[in-house]
Amino acid sequence: MSVRLDARASRHYYDSTFERHAVKILPNEYFVTKGEDLMLSTVLGSCVAACLRDPLTGIGGMNHFMLPDGDAQSPASATMRYGAFAMEVLINELLKAGAARDRLEAKVFGGGAVLSAMQQMNIGERNGQFVLSYLKTENIPVRAQDLGDTHARRIHYFPFDGRVLVRKMAPHHAKAEEVIAHREKLAAQKAQDNSRSAPRIERFDAPKMKVEMFKRPLRRTANAES
């Protein structure tokens, strides 16, 4: 399975509230720590984040997916927006980092009905049902969950010791943050696509301009009239 390199979260920052380095997880991204004492944070509306870790090694990670599953026959299903692919990627990256599959445990969050369009399609509820069903099938125990409801959530996950702090948010606040996060993601992808598709430009040294110098003509004075 090949994973797009830009699916790995890359927004590192220092959180002055928690006094530690952190990584922001945007929609369709994931991040895996290798025992570092990092904080992973995200904002969830109808999306779901699965926080997985190996408690023995402290290796852990988080994903952030938007939809439960896609058409298995479609190439678009193999993207991080779909839960099935996002879970597979997260588990595989944890194992590559040194986690043991039989020690993995999970905490899952999100799936809120925060937008009217999402409520009609039950996207949040379907996301929550999917992640619980997936983890049960994979024999990964769920140690904590906060799914559903009409609230959005801000998640702070500490993979090293397994702590998760959840803050419920007013729907209009969450909507604004998700819009910003989505715009950031689109902007980053557009910039990357532009850099890949930009035509090759050969650069040459600028030619030296030839400047001819002439003697400045003498100014005529009133006394020099003929």
From Swiss-Prot:
The keyword Hydrolase applies. It is an enzyme of class 3 (hydrolase). GO terms for molecular function: protein-glutamine glutaminase activity. Keywords: Chemotaxis, Hydrolase. GO terms for biological process: chemotaxis. The keyword Nucleotidyltransferase does not apply. It catalyses: L-glutaminyl-[protein] + H2O = L-glutamyl-[protein] + NH4(+). It holds the Pfam family CheD. Its EC number is 3.5.1.44. It comes from the Bacteria. Probably deamidates glutamine residues to glutamate on methyl-accepting chemotaxis receptors (MCPs), playing an important role in chemotaxis. NCBIfam families: PRK13487.1, PRK13489.1. HAMAP family: CheD. Belongs to the CheD family. This is Probable chemoreceptor glutamine deamidase CheD. It comes from Bordetella avium (strain 197N). The lineage of its organism: Bacteria, Pseudomonadati, Pseudomonadota, Betaproteobacteria, Burkholderiales. The gene is cheD.
